[in-house]
């Protein structure tokens, strides 16, 4: 019934596109008049548009004319005229939606339309790409159009100094990678001066390959961290011990990606640890004194049994480098969290780097939701449309192709074993190669690509391998994958963003030329060669894309198919599968193997059966659903931290902007003075119960006040009067500092102290949230909702952090005894630059991140070490208390706060 209605009325997407086509006629009707304009008149349109906006017009009032102007500018500058479907894509982007456009449909050119229009407001537009190469390429090629129309263009890539970045961000249109944008946001919120920041306020972002950034990388937080304790030696010792364990000593679950010691494994490892004198004889690994070792053992187990070299990571130049599971690229600068990276370094016998503590972090989910207006483009988004709407409130519109797709997608072939599958792939490659038909073979890992490469080498078939090991040549290799007799092996979607043109890409070949010798003649020769090869390739059937395995996501499979058949070119695609494939082995039905045998599958034979295809699709849907839930769950938890992050960053900015720091200082002084006095002189208590001795100690500790006991000896003195006296004494101390060093210098000093103190307590708070997050899933065993518990405890920790901030700030201000004349703005910036040298930027692994609640095997350890439920604490045994807040009542039962009792010496 539903299919009949769709045929009659069309889908919602069809109706949207039809409506947009009616708007395109308005743009096309303006073209004749725009074509008659001189270059100077066309450029002046930008000034005219800005004037209209200044006088109250909206972007929607000028959208059609602006698009017509960009189309004409592109034609004059680059020789490219926007097709009608590209204009539709531009309207979709301008309206804050995602446009799905097939590979080769010119998404880069489409982005110029909304980028130009929205840049007219002067607030800046960010065009976001997935790597530095694409950011440079697009800013250079499309920048010609913007410059012609009088707009400035910037490009952000890794390693740029701040002054260069600042100029690039101040441009009308800025091309940047998603990583650099996120890290610059975090870095800006760690600086001590507004002038040092590089970013402008958020306005509008257009994300290229939006599905890759907002979905594939959504679970991967951007993290800036600083070094902590050096435990390299211990990682090395534990690694040697874990190598001695037997298969029966642990059990792992590939679906959940978890690994745990068995009872026999615990006994075995305890004896090994004891022999190496790492734990005392007759003690357990889970005794309180040894609990920290559990973390090292678990990470070493993961490193040896859940991670494979050249699949999950590779070793290059003595470093362990992570391979992105979705693109097959090396993730430069990214390190696994929680000591896992150190465990891998120990496993591979390379130098073990120090662990790091988080100083700032954010996920792409929350970073990109900062933009008031967000849009994106990709070749594959419809399968993820519900998630994009649910999480980012972004609608997806699929735009029809300019030319009809003639590519032929052949049925999958399924074999009983990997060897049989490879034999079939080899046979097809040989056939295509002999006919000159170019082939792109997609694999899911470096290991698989090199495995296939060795098979082709034995058969003496020339080919190129594109994977994380050759990232630098990625764009060039993929661009030439459409040449006559070309055979290219690529991991996953490496090279995404670069079109495969039949016959080859002349521009990239021209870039390789020596400009000093016969340059023009060589260009003509290359163009003639490419034209001839294109004819040969079309006659051979176009690009043949071979998939060696199904990916967990149907979208990734569709991306691979989409490399063939661009702009109406001929082409074919085919997937080859075996029962040994990860997806089949882990997620598909266990009955498939039996069914194949029942159907009479023999060695070397392939089978096509609807049930197999359905089972595969169900397996993919199951994994997609599982990953969606994980991303959704991450967002629910991360929103808690995000709300707190926004408050802290807003407060930090207000502090930097403030011209008078005395307001916060005075109010906090009064608040703490009252709190301290009432702690030792409770309201309504008898004078003999007043603890004047400890009151004096605490006032000196916090305010540097030398409290005169004689003040209390007066019979009629009250707690309120004592509070007023203490506040006045504190003000007098501060006033004496102002007289000695001037109000301006004290203002700078107080502001600097407040900022550095805020940074310190925020860093400690992030650490506490990390520990809380890792163990929160265990609350489910107690019939409690982990998310509700996390929200409640995170709020309590946040309140505690604010209290700690006030106390540390006041304590530092009143105890300042250094030469305050030297605390200038320049010194503040110098301090930040010193900190910057030791900071590390990283991307945490999505599968084994601390944010992946439920899959982390430290969950047994961290809640015990960090916080203990008060009712489980033994008053007579401090080792059972866990971490105690300074402002909590001491667990010993004395009735005093912990900081005045057992925590007095901490």
Swiss-Prot record:
May bind 1 zinc ion per subunit. It comes from the Bacteria. Its cofactor is Zn(2+). The lineage of its organism: Bacteria, Pseudomonadati, Pseudomonadota, Alphaproteobacteria, Rickettsiales. Coiled coil: none annotated. GO terms for cellular component: cell envelope Sec protein transport complex; cytosol; plasma membrane. Zn(2+) binds at residues 890, 892, 901-902. The gene is secA. Part of the Sec protein translocase complex. Interacts with the SecYEG preprotein conducting channel. Has a central role in coupling the hydrolysis of ATP to the transfer of proteins into and across the cell membrane, serving both as a receptor for the preprotein-SecB complex and as an ATP-driven molecular motor driving the stepwise translocation of polypeptide chains across the membrane. Its EC number is 7.4.2.8. NCBIfam families: PRK12904.1, secA. This is Protein translocase subunit SecA. ATP binds at residues 86, 104-108, 499. GO terms for molecular function: ATP binding; metal ion binding; protein-exporting ATPase activity. It is an enzyme of class 7 (translocase).
């Amino acid at each position: 019934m539903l299919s009949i209605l769709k045929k009659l009325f069309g889908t919602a997407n069809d109706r949207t596109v039809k409506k947009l086509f009616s708007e395109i006629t308005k743009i096309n009707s303006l073209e004749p008049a725009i074509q008659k304009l001189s270059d100077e008149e066309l450029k002046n349109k930008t000034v005219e548009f800005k004037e209209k906006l200044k006088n109250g017009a909206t972007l929607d009032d000028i959208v059609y004319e602006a698009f017509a102007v960009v189309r004409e500018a592109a034609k004059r500058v680059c020789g490219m005229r926007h097709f009608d479907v590209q204009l539709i894509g531009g309207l979709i982007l301008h309206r804050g939606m995602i446009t799905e456009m097939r590979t080769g449909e010119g998404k880069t050119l489409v982005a110029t339309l909304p980028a130009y229009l929205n840049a007219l407001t002067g607030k800046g537009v960010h065009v976001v790409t997935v790597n530095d190469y694409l950011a440079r390429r697009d800013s250079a090629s499309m920048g010609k159009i913007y410059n012609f129309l009088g707009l400035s263009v910037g490009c952000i890539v890794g390693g740029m100094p701040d002054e260069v970045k600042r100029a690039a961000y101040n441009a009308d249109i800025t091309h940047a990678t998603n990583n650099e944008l996120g890290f610059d946001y975090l870095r800006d919120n760690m600086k001590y001066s507004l002038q040092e920041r590089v970013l402008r306020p958020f306005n509008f972002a257009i994300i290229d390959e939006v599905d890759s950034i907002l979905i594939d990388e959504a679970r991967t937080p951007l993290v800036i961290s600083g070094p902590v304790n050096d435990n390299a030696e211990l990682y090395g010792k534990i690694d040697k011990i874990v190598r001695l364990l037997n298969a029966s000593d642990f059990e792992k679950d590939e679906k959940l990606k978890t690994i745990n010691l068995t009872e026999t494994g615990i006994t075995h490892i305890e004896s090994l640890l004891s022999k190496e004198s790492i734990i005392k004889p007759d003690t357990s690994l889970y005794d309180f004194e040894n609990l920290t070792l559990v973390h090292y053992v678990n990470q070493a187990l993961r490193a040896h049994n859940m991670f494979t070299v050249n699949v999950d990571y590779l070793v290059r130049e003595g470093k362990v480098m992570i391979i992105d599971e979705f693109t097959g690229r090396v993730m430069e600068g990214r390190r696994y969290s929680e000591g896992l990276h150190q465990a891998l370094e120990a496993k591979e016998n390379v130098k073990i780097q120090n662990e790091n503590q988080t100083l700032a972090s954010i996920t792409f989910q929350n970073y990109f939701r900062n933009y008031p207006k967000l849009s994106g483009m990709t070749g594959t988004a419809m399968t993820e449309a519900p998630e994009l709407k649910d999480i980012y409130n972004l609608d997806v519109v699929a735009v029809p192709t300019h030319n009809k797709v003639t590519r032929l997608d052949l049925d999958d072939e399924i074999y009983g074993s990997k060897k049989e599958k490879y034999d079939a792939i080899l046979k097809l490659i040989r056939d295509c190669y002999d006919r000159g038909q170019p082939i792109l073979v997609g694999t899911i890992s470096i290991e698989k690509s090199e495995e296939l490469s060795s098979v082709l080498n034995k058969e003496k078939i020339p080919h190129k391998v594109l994977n994380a090991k050759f990232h630098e040549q990625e764009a060039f290799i993929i661009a030439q994958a459409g040449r006559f007799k070309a055979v290219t092996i690529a991991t996953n979607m490496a090279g995404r963003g670069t079109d495969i043109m039949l016959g080859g890409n002349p521009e990239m070949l021209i870039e390789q030329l020596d400009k000093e010798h016969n340059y023009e003649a060589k260009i003509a020769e290359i163009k003639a060669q490419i034209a001839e090869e294109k004819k040969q390739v079309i006659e051979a059937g176009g690009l043949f894309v071979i998939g060696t395995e199904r990916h967990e996501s149907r979208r990734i499979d569709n991306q691979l198919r989409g490399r063939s058949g661009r702009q109406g070119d001929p082409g074919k695609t085919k997937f080859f599968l075996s029962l040994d494939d990860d997806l089949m082995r882990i997620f598909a039905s266990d009955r498939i193997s039996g069914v194949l045998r029942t159907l009479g599958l023999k060695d070397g034979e392939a089978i096509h059966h609807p049930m197999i295809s359905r089972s595969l699709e169900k397996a993919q849907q199951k994994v997609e659903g599982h990953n969606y839930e994980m991303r959704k769950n991450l967002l629910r938890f991360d929103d808690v931290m995000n709300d707190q992050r926004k408050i802290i960053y807003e407060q930090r900015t207000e502090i930097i902007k403030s011209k008078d720091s005395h307001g916060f200082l005075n109010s906090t002084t009064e608040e703490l003075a009252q709190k301290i006095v009432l702690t030792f002189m409770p309201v309504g208590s008898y004078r003999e119960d007043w603890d004047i001795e400890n009151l004096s100690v605490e006032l000196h500790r916090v305010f540097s006040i030398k409290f005169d006991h004689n003040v209390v000896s007066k019979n009629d003195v009250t707690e309120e009067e004592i509070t007023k006296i203490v506040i006045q004494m504190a003000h007098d101390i501060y006033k004496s500092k102002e007289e000695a060093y001037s109000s301006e210098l004290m203002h700078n000093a107080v502001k600097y102290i407040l900022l550095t103190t805020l940074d310190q307590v925020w860093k400690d708070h992030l650490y506490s949230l990390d520990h809380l997050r890792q163990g929160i899933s265990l609350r489910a065993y107690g019939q409690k909702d982990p998310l509700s518990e996390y929200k409640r405890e995170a709020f309590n920790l946040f309140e505690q952090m604010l209290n700690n901030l006030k106390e540390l700030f006041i304590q530092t201000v009143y105890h300042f005894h250094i030469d305050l004349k030297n605390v200038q703005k320049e010194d503040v910036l110098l301090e930040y630059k010193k900190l910057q040298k030791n900071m590390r930027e990283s991307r945490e692994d999505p599968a084994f991140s601390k944010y992946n609640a439920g899959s982390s095997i430290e969950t047994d350890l961290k809640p015990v070490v960090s916080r203990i439920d008060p009712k489980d604490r033994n008053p007579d045994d401090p080792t059972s208390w866990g971490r105690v807040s300074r402002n909590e009542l001491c667990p010993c039962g004395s009735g005093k706060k912990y900081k005045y009792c057992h925590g007095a010496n901490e």
